[in-house]
Regions:
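Accessory, charged alpha-helical segments in nucleic-acid-processing enzymes
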Residues: 1-249, 324-329, 343-353, 371, ...
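Conserved helicase NTPase catalytic core signature
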Residues: 158-254, 382, 405-520
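Conserved ATP-binding/catalytic motifs of P-loop helicase motor domains
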Residues: 175, 200, 275, 280-283, ...
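P-loop NTPase Walker
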Residues: 238-243, 247-381, 385-388, 392
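Structural motif
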Residues: 270, 298-300, 503-504, 525, ...
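Extended alpha-helical coiled-coil "stalk/arm" regions
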Residues: 375-416
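Conserved helicase motor core of SF1/SF2 NTP-dependent helicases
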Residues: 494-495, 508-523, 531-650
């Protein structure tokens, strides 16, 4: 089997795993508008009448991507209090607990390997995580007869919430309302019933599944995607500029400098960022450095907040123009992109832009930067020299004091010696102040350099590709999606990346934001990778020439409800030659397993956040004392970071 066919089989396997795992729908009520063609039955006796089958079959065939046919077992009934826009409301919920892949056979036989647990039903319990893990680890083949076991699991996870088995039956919304009219707030019932229905798939899940389908059917895969799945490929580098940390405002640690090098030189790399080690700041540095080297960068994560934090660091901390960075996948994304294009297209004529691009300001800026960097090197060398000399003088004084004893005249000698040394060398504090001022001057010059680089990129794109940019704007203004797709199909998306090289997006929003073009970006950075399942990351990996996976293996992984039996069956179906564990492994596990060069794995080892007493436990027990505690200062050693307070009758 060739490398491409092996990769395609692995993608098809992960596609089915993801589809089975995300076949569950977070339904607050089986009577939701997302559900149609409901058919109820007592537990274990669901049959599909011919007229029902004839109605549902055309729907499933016509909307295979948008809708699915599901079998539901057990329902959690209760009243839920919610607060929206400052107004508290109480509503009755009828949430299915389990769902399965279903067929339109007359007699329904459950495929228990496809069992999924409805997240909404579990979220009704405060101890949701423990409940998820209980059902994930203990799914049973005879789920329809396990009334007592289910009640026991629900009660054990949260004993303060009463739940009882109800014998009530219902066949539609009206009969449900009648059966549970007097239900009390805070008490839940488990109803042993079955139902089948056509359910609308979530848009985000649908997008990932569609792109996985396209990948599985294709034969062109990016290097990072193949390497992540264990392919043995030779490294290839074409015109990649080496990393230059001098382009970044601020001071970087050695590990952060190594990360810059790794992002430039490695096709598949891993950045381990324990809490408080500046992970988001480092990602911002990585993106900015590659931007300054003329490359495009895609930053993705499952966590929307993590993406926003990185964007703020790039624009606010480093001052990169909003016109050079695009936060995609959000509700107002198309409007924001159109505004960006409007701003770019309103620039002055190409003659003026070219004159700006060739203006002497760029060379003058570099000359000033070189001068400041030289001054910094000299000032730092002088500081080290003074420090060592002061250290030597101090040792001499100590020896003199020890040898001559505590004579009165010795104090006068020490005072004279100290004054003589200070007058000749100056205070170390003065040297530090000089270095701080030089760093400030350097950072200001680098900020101007970044701004100049962004302007030059826009000017270059305007001069050579204004027509293409106008085409993108026309596509965004199109009233119908079909018209939009038709315009976009004739455009070169890489041109848009010339003027806006840095893009940030959630994994779920990627499909509606960027075309699935192999190696569209030079670099993709996948943040919070510990929480990312393998399948949802593949479309992002396909879009880049190089990839850096970022996260912390010590943090909690994503939770999957895919059963082991189902995963094993799918693995056998596709005859996988490489073991891929979708259920238990995240993308970061895959990176740790398949990265072969140790130089492609970097750990940020300087902790800046917590007091030493707080982080020391984690450092010693989880990170093998590899973290350097940058908060460990003499002024903090006298403070107690942890206090034990005894509370009576607590």
């Amino acid at each position: 089997m060739s490398v491409n066919s092996t990769t395609a089989a692995a993608i098809a396997f992960l596609h089915e795993c993801f589809e089975s795992d995300n076949g569950r729908h977070e339904l607050g009520s089986i009577f939701s508008s997302k559900v149609e063609q409901l058919l109820f039955s007592p537990a274990g006796s669901l049959q599909v009448p011919d007229d029902y089958r004839n109605t549902v079959l055309p729907i499933i065939e016509s909307y295979r991507r948008e809708k699915s046919f599901r079998h539901f077992s057990y329902f959690i009934i209760g009243k839920q209090k919610s607060n929206r826009y400052g107004k508290t409301t109480v509503s009755t919920v009828c949430a299915p607990l389990f769902s399965f892949e279903a067929s339109l056979e007359k007699q329904q036989v459950l495929d228990t390997s496809s069992l999924s647990v409805n997240n909404f039903a579990l979220s009704l319990w405060p101890n949701e995580k423990a409940l998820k893990e209980a059902f994930s680890a203990n799914s049973t083949d005879n789920i329809q007869t396990q009334h007592d076991a289910i009640i026991e699991r629900l009660s054990a996870s949260n004993p303060d919430i009463p739940i009882t088995l109800s014998t009530a039956e219902f066949h539609d919304k009206a009969s449900f309302n009648k059966a549970f009219k007097g239900i009390e707030l805070g008490h839940y019932y488990l109803v042993a019933m079955d139902a089948c229905a056509v359910v609308e798939k979530s848009i985000s899940t649908r997008g990932i599944l569609d792109e996985l389908s396209l990948l599985a059917a294709g034969d062109q895969f990016s290097k990072p995607l193949q390497l992540s799945l264990g392919a043995d490929l030779a490294s290839e580098f074409h015109n990649v500029k080496p990393a230059n940390h001098q382009l970044i405002p601020g001071i970087l640690s050695n590990a952060q400098k190594e990360a810059l090098t790794c992002a430039a030189e490695s096709e598949f790399s891993l950045l381990i960022g324990p809490p408080g080690t500046g992970k988001s700041y480092t990602i911002a540095c990585l993106a900015l450095e590659r931007f300054m080297q003329g490359e495009s960068v895609l930053i993705v994560s499952k966590n929307e907040h993590a993406i926003d934090v990185i964007k703020d660091k790039i624009t606010e901390t480093f001052g990169l123009s909003q016109s050079s960075i695009m936060r995609a996948g959000t509700k107002g994304y198309h409007r924001e992109l159109k505004q960006h294009l409007d701003h770019i297209l309103q620039e002055k004529s190409h003659k003026n832009t070219l004159s700006k691009e060739r203006s002497p300001s760029g060379s003058q800026l570099k000359k000033s930067l070189n001068q400041v960097n030289n001054d910094l090197r000299m000032a730092e060398a002088e500081l080290i020299k003074r420090f060592r000399r002061a250290e030597h003088e101090g040792e001499l004084l100590h020896q003199l004091e020890s040898g001559l004893g505590n004579f009165r005249w010795l104090k006068q000698v020490r005072l004279w010696w100290s004054q003589r040394y200070s007058n000749s060398q100056g205070l170390l504090q003065e040297s530090l102040k000089k270095i701080q001022n030089l760093h400030k001057k350097r950072d200001d010059l680098l900020a101007k350099n970044i701004d100049q680089s962004a302007t030059n990129k826009i000017n270059h794109t305007l001069f050579h590709h204004r027509r293409q940019l106008t085409g993108f704007k026309s596509a965004l203004s199109a009233r119908t999606s079909s018209r939009q797709e038709k315009i976009l199909a004739g455009l070169d998306f890489s041109i848009l990346l010339e003027s806006m090289p840095i893009w940030l997006c959630s994994l779920e929003g990627l499909h509606k934001t960027l075309p699935l073009i192999p190696e569209l970006f030079d670099l993709v950075i996948i943040d919070e990778a510990t929480q990312c399942d393998i399948a949802s990351c593949l479309p992002a990996l396909q879009r880049a020439k190089r990839a850096m996976v970022v996260g912390d293996p010590k943090q909690l992984r994503h939770i999957s409800f895919l059963s082991k039996n189902k995963q094993q069956a799918l693995s056998e179906k596709y005859s996988l030659s490489r073991e891929i564990n979708y259920r238990d492994h995240s993308l970061i596990d895959l990176a740790q397993r398949h990265i072969q060069q140790q130089s492609s794995i970097i750990m940020l080892n300087e902790h800046y956040r917590s007091a030493p007493d707080i982080i020391r436990f984690s450092n010693e027990n989880f990170y093998d004392s590899r973290l350097r505690l940058m908060t460990e200062k003499p002024t903090l050693t006298t403070k107690n970071s942890i206090a034990v307070i005894h509370v009576e009758q607590a």
